[in-house]
Every structure is written in structure tokens, then in C-alpha cells.
């Protein structure tokens, strides 16, 4: 991508591959991708944020694409994932950062905002609830059980890796809709994603984020008192119920929720103009 420079950054005992763009003296925005993406999932957001004067970094998170993939499920507990990002923030700025996260990246962002708020100025969470809402509401809300059933499957050893690798990563491709939506994803985009998934050890590392859940990754009850936030939510998300979004807004008093019609879990790809507008509007007006 034009204007994006990739580098390797040591943080929290590992090395992360980081895409960086924008003026070095601009306010720092950290973009955190979710499963099964990598830094390139923010391709529609980086330039508008840079054009608005921000310094933007988008890491491949631990276990993804070109970043380190430590062995063992315990290496993917949410406190560890959070500390990776704290290390990045402190290397790129002496000030507080703005963190924008989608899916699992949003879970890390929420956890950072709830447990180490001194590093954040603002949080924007895209189609991801506060982790403690996810943990406490899901067992009491049967419609979410089916939506989350894949998480139980991911706990199995080896079998999920084999199934995700079948037919040239067809399951992951279809989960995002890469090959089915040429208006959103070019053939180059599809190739980039599949190359990321093919990295040695990547599938196991990516799945270990989920496997760490059974080891108490979310055992801590982080505060609902977070930094100022905006939550953006595609109404047609087939993985996460809108109830989780509403419960997050109810419990977390320092922000607000915006629903977007005709958008799914992958809203940052489907409605980039709207997402970018909602991000920049919030950052400028609050």
C-alpha cells in the first residue's frame, strides 16, 4: 500500500510485524485486527486516518502473518495480548494512544481500556462487546450459543487446523466472503489473506487465542469504567448478537453505541466510508 512502511518491533518478549503510516509527530492510532485477518484488514481505514493527520500503526497481532508465534496456549492469554500493545504504544509515542479494534482486536482494546487506561485516550470498538459482557451474558442468552458454537469446535486439538486448511482455506475465505465479493476484495486481496494463513504455525497460533479462553483468559473481571469509547456495530453480524452490544452500552457509562444497517461483522470492509466517517467524527468532536 502506498505510504505504508512495514517494520519489525520487539515488544513483550516477542517481535511483531507492524505496518506504519503517517507523520511521526501525529497523534497515534493503533489498529487491532481480529480473527482471521491481519494488518491488511485495515486497508480501507489507514489512508483516511493518515490524511486526517494521525500516525497510524497496524500490527499483525501475536500469532498472525509475519509476527512471532510462540508455542503454547498460555502465550495467548488476554493479559499477554494486551501487554504486546502497551509495548507498541510506548515505543511509538510518549502520549496516550487512540486504539481501534475489530473482533478479537476489539477484545484486546476493551481489556486494555479497562485494566490499563493510562495508555489510552479513546477507544473505538467495532462489532465486539466488552469481554466481561461476552462472558456473563452469553451463558444466559441461548441465541448467542449457536452463534458461538464454533468456539467450542476450536478447542479441539489439530482437527480445526486441518479443516481450515482444506480446499485452499475455503472455510476462512467464506467466513469473510473474500472470493464471493469481488466488489470488496480484489484477487490480490485474496492472495494476501491466503499467504498470511499459510505462514508456518499461523493457524495453530490464531486458534490458540480461542483455546486460551478455557484456561481462564477472561477470568479477571475488568472494570466497566473505561476510557471514552464509541462502539460501531453492523446490524447483520451473524457471529455476535446485538444484545451484547446493548448490554455493553448499558454497563459501560463512558461512551455510546451506533448501529449501522445493511452491514455484517465485516463492516469495516462493507461500509468503509461510513466507518471512517464515524471514526473521524468521534475523534474530532469529542
Swiss-Prot record:
The keyword Methyltransferase does not apply. One of its GO terms (molecular function) is hydrolase activity. Keywords: Hydrolase. Its EC number is 3.-.-.-. InterPro entries: AB_hydrolase_1, AB_hydrolase_fold, Epox_hydrolase-like. SUPFAM superfamilies: alpha/beta-Hydrolases. The active site is at 103 (nucleophile), 210 (proton donor), 265 (proton acceptor). This is AB hydrolase superfamily protein YfhM. The lineage of its organism: Bacteria, Bacillati, Bacillota, Bacilli, Bacillales.
Amino acid at each position: 500500500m502506498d505510504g505504508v512502511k512495514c517494520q519489525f518491533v520487539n515488544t513483550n518478549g516477542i517481535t511483531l510485524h507492524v505496518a506504519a503510516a503517517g507523520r511521526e509527530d501525529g497523534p497515534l492510532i493503533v489498529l487491532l485486527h481480529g480473527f482471521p485477518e491481519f494488518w491488511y484488514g485495515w486497508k480501507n481505514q489507514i489512508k483516511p486516518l493518515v490524511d486526517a493527520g494521525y500516525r497510524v500503526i497496524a500490527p499483525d497481532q501475536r500469532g498472525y502473518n509475519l509476527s512471532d508465534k510462540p508455542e503454547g496456549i498460555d502465550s495467548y492469554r488476554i493479559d499477554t495480548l494486551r501487554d504486546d500493545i502497551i509495548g507498541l504504544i510506548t515505543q511509538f509515542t510518549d502520549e496516550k494512544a487512540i486504539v481501534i479494534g475489530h473482533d478479537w482486536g476489539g477484545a484486546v482494546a476493551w481489556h486494555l481500556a479497562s485494566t490499563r487506561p493510562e495508555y489510552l485516550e479513546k477507544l473505538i470498538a467495532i462489532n465486539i462487546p466488552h469481554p466481561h459482557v461476552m462472558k456473563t451474558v452469553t451463558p444466559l442468552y441461548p441465541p448467542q450459543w449457536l452463534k458461538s458454537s464454533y468456539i467450542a469446535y476450536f478447542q479441539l486439538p489439530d482437527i480445526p487446523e486441518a479443516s481450515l486448511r482444506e480446499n485452499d482455506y475455503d472455510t476462512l475465505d467464506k467466513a469473510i466472503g473474500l472470493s464471493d465479493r469481488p466488489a470488496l476484495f480484489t484477487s490480490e486481496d485474496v492472495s494476501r489473506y491466503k499467504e498470511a494463513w499459510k505462514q508456518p504455525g499461523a493457524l495453530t497460533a490464531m486458534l490458540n487465542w480461542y483455546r486460551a479462553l478455557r484456561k481462564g483468559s477472561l477470568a479477571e473481571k475488568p472494570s466497566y469504567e473505561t476510557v471514552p469509547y464509541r462502539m460501531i456495530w453492523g446490524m447483520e453480524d451473524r457471529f455476535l448478537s446485538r444484545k451484547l452490544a446493548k448490554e455493553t452500552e448499558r454497563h459501560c457509562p463512558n461512551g455510546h453505541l451506533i448501529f449501522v444497517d445493511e452491514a455484517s461483522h465485516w463492516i469495516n470492509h462493507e461500509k468503509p466510508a461510513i466507518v471512517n466517517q464515524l471514526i473521524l467524527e468521534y475523534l474530532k468532536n469529542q
